[in-house]
Amino acid sequence: MKETILEMERYAEENNIPIIEVDSIKFIMKYIKLNNVKSVLELGTAIGYSAILMANATSTVEITTIEKDEKRYREAVKNVNKCGLD
């Protein structure tokens, strides 16, 4: 999964796609763990970067994420699948 995350960061940089800042996602992942969060609704999937990382915060969290852009949606699905998530 780590390699996929690095690929996603490069892809986002090269294609001007906004993804969450590292400090922000670290905070959110810690919050999910400490508060035993069971579900998250994310609006704006982009390429799936934050959804994948949040899904890996704990084994019990369920992420629902919504993306209106068809191209980004397809890219996100591809990335989620590459990380073994669905």
Model-identified regions with their sequence ranges:
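A short alpha-helical cap/connector motif
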Residues: M1-D86
